[in-house]
């Protein structure tokens, strides 16, 4: 054997970077295996991080001392807070990124991480001893011993690119696919499937008629992702906005038979919420146009990413399509768009720790689990890396539940329900989104990260100072109070009931702001802006959070009822054959997870509750890894 590590991570994309960094932060001797070190942190598709739901994940990664938020701040060239006019629960931070700056910042961060080594090579096979993962073999003959492996293969597992009639075996354009690992996973008994995603053509921005287009600038007060970022280093750029036309749609309809999607060459399912331009024209044929965002890929790079027209049409048709779009009539295409098919593992094969049920020591994260998106991949990577390090060290696994974070919502959805199409995070997937806000990710998760040893000293210090300031502001707001008559002197119309109301109570009123309170108690005007904003959000949500706490208590009660691993569902009377098969496949760990399974009925769940209570199993008595 060449060398031994505690954890080996395969893949240098967003999931792999977070997995390797998390394992190393826990003290595990970690190797990141990638084809080429210079592609680590590459943004394979759109040059952006965050968005609705996705921005919440980035903030949670940051709260656990992950890298994506910090790196996005260093590489960001346009920052916007989406849904700014709506409530804080559904606001989503987003940043356009310079591809080169982002990848460079990620590579620098990993190079500075103690306990982490980069190994260039292609993973070929897993070494298994008595059913447990014990090492990794590369295609060049090198073998490594390890306590756990994290696979973050992205679109590389038997990847096949489609551009019209052209098919190219590749993990992404210009890079070879990974062929051996799919066979290894099948040999281990894991169920594999096939999914598809796509990317649009790239354009030479110097040939775009920007003067004819609507421009979208960044926010005047850009908000960073990371709590550690004190200043954003790069100038902000604007994006252009254009639309397809009826002429565009006519060209696409005339050439559908040449599209890989519509000619039958691709049979796998693509992401519902990121459809190709062919899909948009076919499914929404009554629309007169579809919006396209023209996103610069870098400060010193003329390449532009036309967000909204991913395609599998041939190159000549792509050029014809572009010529019909306002502002792009004379555009030069730097690289054609394409669709890519790849293998994935049914995520119901996994524990909520992201460890494979049939292969102890094997963890999966990212697109291999049927998700789409950088942020979804990175969040899974962090959790998988954390648990791989704990597995290698003989510790128990860590589960983030649906009431703790969007990471928990996503993983629970995956391992409980599986996927029929690439999974994307939305705020609507979370039952407790008033609690799971982007603004309070650190309050929800950083202390847990500290307890696990996942959070470093710099973040611990920043978090400690922030919480001390916030606690002091809350305490002061609850201490200061006023009568309705006193409030009236300051222009506040309160119910004349004689009751004194605290400053915190007053902030819960929709028309009362921190600025209003500063007119009564000037000390509120002296609060650090971030602390003041957080205080106001906390106050306005307080009554709703109290109600949601009861729902969370119910969730926790159900999650405390454990279903034994060895439970034979075929022998349980009262269950339909369909449910017996689903329960046997998923093997839910708790009553809560069983209740979220597709097809579960109240009667069947009541039967399982009775059985779980009779067995007397408690969550803390059951190993979670």
Curated annotation (Swiss-Prot):
Cytoplasm is among the record's keywords: yes
Alphabetized UniProt keyword annotations: Cytoplasm, FAD, Flavoprotein, NAD, tRNA processing
InterPro entries per the UniProt record, alphabetical: FAD/NAD-bd_sf (IPR036188), GIDA_C_N (IPR049312), MnmG (IPR004416), MnmG-rel (IPR002218), MnmG-rel_CS (IPR020595), MnmG_C (IPR026904), MnmG_C_subdom (IPR047001), MnmG_C_subdom_sf (IPR044920)
SUPFAM superfamilies, alphabetized: FAD/NAD(P)-binding domain (SSF51905)
Subcellular location: Cytoplasm
CC per GO annotation: cytosol
Gene3D superfamilies from the UniProt entry: FAD/NAD(P)-binding domain (3.50.50.60), GidA associated domain, C-terminal subdomain (1.10.150.570), tRNA uridine 5-carboxymethylaminomethyl modification enzyme MnmG/GidA (1.10.10.1800)
Main location: cytoplasm
GO biological process, one term: tRNA methylation
Alphabetical list of PROSITE patterns matching this protein: GIDA_1, GIDA_2
Entry-linked Pfam families: GIDA, GIDA_C_1st, SAM_GIDA_C
Sequence positions that bind NAD(+): 270-284
Binding site for FAD: 11-16
Cofactor(s) needed for function: FAD
Lineage top rank: taxon: Bacteria
GO molecular function: flavin adenine dinucleotide binding
SMART domains: GIDA_assoc_3
Assembly information from the UniProt record: Homodimer. Heterotetramer of two MnmE and two MnmG subunits.
Similarity comment: Belongs to the MnmG family.
Summary of the function given for this chain in its UniProt record: NAD-binding protein involved in the addition of a carboxymethylaminomethyl (cmnm) group at the wobble position (U34) of certain tRNAs, forming tRNA-cmnm(5)s(2)U34.
Descriptive protein name: tRNA uridine 5-carboxymethylaminomethyl modification enzyme MnmG
Species: Azorhizobium caulinodans (strain ATCC 43989 / DSM 5975 / JCM 20966 / LMG 6465 / NBRC 14845 / NCIMB 13405 / ORS 571)
